[in-house]
Curated annotation (Swiss-Prot):
The keyword Repeat belongs to this UniProt entry's keyword annotation: no
GO cellular component: mismatch repair complex
NCBIfam families: mutl, PRK00095.2-4
Molecular function terms, GO-annotated: ATP binding; ATP hydrolysis activity; ATP-dependent DNA damage sensor activity; mismatched DNA binding
GO process annotations (BP): mismatch repair
Organism: Phenylobacterium zucineum (strain HLK1)
Entry similarity comment: Belongs to the DNA mismatch repair MutL/HexB family.
TM segment ranges: none
Taxonomic lineage: Bacteria, Pseudomonadati, Pseudomonadota, Alphaproteobacteria, Caulobacterales
Keywords carried by this UniProt record: DNA damage, DNA repair
Keyword DNA damage tagged: yes
Function: This protein is involved in the repair of mismatches in DNA. It is required for dam-dependent methyl-directed DNA mismatch repair. May act as a 'molecular matchmaker', a protein that promotes the formation of a stable complex between two or more DNA-binding proteins in an ATP-dependent manner without itself being part of a final effector complex.
Name of encoding gene: mutL
Protein name per the record: DNA mismatch repair protein MutL
InterPro entries attached to this UniProt entry: DNA_mismatch_repair_CS (IPR014762), DNA_mismatch_repair_MutL (IPR020667), DNA_mismatch_S5_2-like (IPR013507), HATPase_C_sf (IPR036890), MutL/Mlh/PMS (IPR002099), MutL/Mlh/Pms-like (IPR038973), MutL_C (IPR014790), MutL_C_dimsub (IPR042120)
Length: 622
């Protein structure tokens, strides 16, 4: 079969399949063009899930009549400029787009129209022009009406009409519209100073006014998109290391979800889905969340464009870092520092969920019987104090039966009569978790604070305390090692074996002693005693994978921490153990002094705080 040159129309359609996978991809490309043009206001309209019509209007710098026909040519762009030596450097890209493929790709599979008015340097208003592209055929430039002083309006109709086979792979109109909404939200998170609006089938579904540039404006934008609960339970992140800066907001461990859909990652203002960044985020929360729970976060990585390659994915959804270990370490370290600074703080949703469990209920009128009442009254009957208490709080009747009958009768008769022995007056102390007042079901500690009540799960709280103490001891004293009776030889790829041996000193500090054993093999002499009977070969292979991918021996650290977590769970105060008042208060004080004590190792809250105002609302006092 002879080799043939493909016609330009077919080449553009092939490129369109890589760049424009669905309507949301077209919206992404057009919105990025608007942002690169300096737009401060972007409006998007989508009909029929974006397949019937897409309109993206902006107030950017616009296009002149001379630029319009060039803009729809493949590989024509204003975003790449040659250096002093005349060479183009793809590793110094400061814009969102750079390939010049979006408009010609869309025009090859749809009916595309661009109307634009360029911004003039002297401030005067230029004439507006338009150009049409249909199935790859480019029309002539003509004068057009344009509502604004400058900017562009790009309209896409009948997307994929020229490639009907692609339509078979589209989802429902509603699903495609949701994908467009999510894409616009991601772009809006990265550019809080730009206002965004979205109309779906003629109905305004998203409106995000411009916010002030900076952390406060960014948090306001995130709150508008991710919900007020996120901003109430978010930790501010701002760390820098060797020219790489990490900023943004991450949720408290107790504020988590069952999937990773609420994790947003950005590199130099570009939304990305990167395995390295997602893995670093997961590793930072490894001490706080179970494997099936995921944190909420919006993280922004900023670094020199020469240190990251954005030209590794057709849709620019993935990036590659020159020093992935540096970026990963910055994310893990920055997040853990913020989590440690949070101390024993737990998410507000924990107390809200607890309050939601309380529902005012009307008691049905009890039926009179031969027992359980003291006297008849007009219009009804008066139960005995013990019976009334049993109706309100089951189990209290036993306590009431042991009380002095005279005191109960006096209470029932007088209602407001003073008790024989007044309750002790609480003198508030400046302890965040208050002073212990009782233990309930030998599992929960009830403490009184200055402005409310704290309920502590004694097992979950002590589990976190033991775990943090074990980690600190391991960091200070090193990891104890145990020698293998028979040293084990582990076969590896020669490059992997070389990487493992090169990190032998680091591994020895973690309790794993290895040495070279010929080409493509390492000899394991000692393993961490904490791991007990472990699969040394599997451990070394996991470490080799980590060194290859991240440049760090993460598998060993994570296994050690996992074992510490298991030991802490078994070595902590169990539910069902009765504690004395000094023991309960000691536990509260340790929680206040220990980082991450607001949640156990599995992400469950260790305590719930109920404010006095909330309790008063439950009883109709507010």
């Amino acid at each position: 079969m002879p080799i043939r040159r493909l016609p330009p129309e077919l080449i553009n359609r092939i490129a369109a399949g890589e760049v424009v996978e669905r309507p949301a991809s077209a919206v992404k490309e057009l919105v990025e063009n608007a942002l690169d043009a300096g737009a401060t206001k972007i409006e998007v309209q989508a009909d029929g899930g974006g397949l019937t019509r897409i309109l993206v209007a902006d107030d950017g710098c616009g296009l002149s009549a001379e630029e319009l026909p060039v803009a729809v040519e493949r590989h024509a762009t204003s975003k790449l400029n040659p250096g002093e030596d005349g060479e183009y450097d793809l590793l110094r890209i400061g814009t969102l787009g750079f390939r010049g493929e979006a408009l010609p790709s869309i025009g090859s599979v749809a009916r595309l129209s661009i109307a634009s008015r360029a911004r003039k340097a002297d401030g005067s208003q230029a004439e507006a022009h338009a150009i049409f592209v249909e199935g790859g055929a480019v029309g002539a430039v003509s004068p057009a009406a344009f509502p604004g002083p400058h900017g562009a309006r790009v309209e896409v109709r009948d997307l994929f009409y020229a490639t009907p086979a692609r339509l078979k792979f589209m989802k429902s109109e509603r699903a495609e519209a949701l994908a467009i909404t999510e894409e616009l939200k991601r772009q809006a998170m990265a550019h809080e100073a730009v206002s965004f609006a979205l109309d779906v089938d003629g109905r305004r579904t998203l409106r995000l006014p411009a916010e002030a540039a900076g952390p406060d404006g960014r948090l306001a934008r995130l709150s508008a998109i991710m919900g007020r609960e996120f901003s109430d339970n978010a930790l501010a992140i701002d760390h820098e290391r060797e020219g790489v800066r990490l900023s943004g907001f991450a949720g408290l461990p107790t504020f988590n979800r069952g999937n990773a859909a609420h994790q947003y990652l950005f590199v130099n203002g570009r939304p990305v889905r990167d395995r390295l960044l997602q893995g670093a985020l997961r590793a930072a929360y490894a001490d706080f969340l179970a494997r099936d729970r995921h944190p909420l976060a919006a993280l922004y990585v900023e670094l020199d464009p020469s240190q990251v390659d954005v030209n590794v994915h057709p849709a620019k959804a993935e990036v590659r870092f020159r020093d992935p270990g540096l970026v990963r370490g910055l994310i893990v370290g920055g997040l853990r520092h913020a989590l440690a600074a949070a101390g024993h703080r737990a998410s507000t949703t924990v107390s809200m969920a607890a309050l939601g469990g309380f529902r005012p209920q009307s008691m049905p009128p009890p039926q009179p019987s031969a027992a359980g009442f003291s006297a008849w009254r007009q219009g009804g009957w008066t139960p005995s104090p013990a019976a009334a208490a049993a109706q309100i709080l089951p189990g209290l009747s036993e306590v009431s039966a042991r009380a002095e009958p005279e005191a109960l009768d006096a209470y029932a008769a007088g209602g407001m009569a003073e008790a024989a022995s007044p309750a002790p007056v609480f003198d508030p102390v400046d302890y965040p978790l208050g002073a212990a007042r009782a233990q309930v079901h030998e599992t929960y500690i009830v403490a009184q604070t200055r402005d409310g009540v704290v309920i502590v799960d004694q097992h979950a709280a002590h589990e976190r305390l033991v775990y943090e103490r074990m980690k600190a001891e391991m960091a200070e004293g090193g990891v104890a090692r145990q020698a293998l009776l028979l040293p084990e030889v582990v076969e590896l790829d020669p490059a992997e074996a070389e990487r493992v041996v090169a990190r032998a000193d680091e591994l020895a500090a973690l309790g794993l002693v290895v040495e070279a054993f010929g080409p493509g093999a390492v000899l394991v002499r000692e393993v961490p005693a904490l791991l007990g009977e472990t699969d040394a070969a599997g451990l070394v292979r996991d470490i080799a994978d980590d060194l290859s991918e991240n440049g760090q021996a993460l598998a060993l650290k994570e296994r050690l921490e996992e074992v510490c977590g298991t030991m802490a769970c078994h070595g902590s105060v169990r539910a069902g153990r009765r504690l004395t008042a000094p023991e309960m208060n000691a536990l509260l004080r340790q929680m206040e002094a220990t980082p991450h004590s607001g949640q156990c190792n599995h992400g469950r809250p260790t305590y719930v705080e109920l404010k006095l105002a909330d309790i008063e609302r439950l009883f109709g006092r507010r």
